[in-house]
Amino acid sequence: NLYQFKNMIECAGTRTWIAYVKYGAYTYAYT
């Protein structure tokens, strides 16, 4: 179950994670 979740994050969430990091850095820069 945890492995499946991890695999889902690695496959479908990689680009989303990158976008999230960029958004987080953008928000942090203007905080």
Swiss-Prot record:
Localisation: Secreted
Free-text function comment from the UniProt entry: Snake venom phospholipase A2 (PLA2) that inhibits neuromuscular transmission by blocking acetylcholine release from the nerve termini. PLA2 catalyzes the calcium-dependent hydrolysis of the 2-acyl groups in 3-sn-phosphoglycerides.
GO MF annotation: an example: toxin activity
Principal subcellular localization: secreted
A GO CC annotation given for this chain: extracellular region
EC id: 3.1.1.4
Catalysed conversion reaction: a 1,2-diacyl-sn-glycero-3-phosphocholine + H2O = a 1-acyl-sn-glycero-3-phosphocholine + a fatty acid + H(+)
Name recorded for this polypeptide: Basic phospholipase A2 13
Cofactor: Ca(2+)
Cofactor note: Binds 1 Ca(2+) ion.
Coiled-coil intervals, chain numbering: none
Known tissue expression: Expressed by the venom gland.
Organism field: Bungarus fasciatus
InterPro entries with a match to the protein in the record: PLipase_A2_dom_sf (IPR036444)
GO biological process: arachidonate secretion; lipid catabolic process; phospholipid metabolic process
Family of the protein in this entry: Belongs to the phospholipase A2 family. Group I subfamily.
Taxonomic lineage of the native organism: Eukaryota, Metazoa, Chordata, Craniata, Vertebrata
Keywords tagged on the record: Calcium, Hydrolase, Lipid degradation, Lipid metabolism, Neurotoxin, Presynaptic neurotoxin, Secreted, Toxin
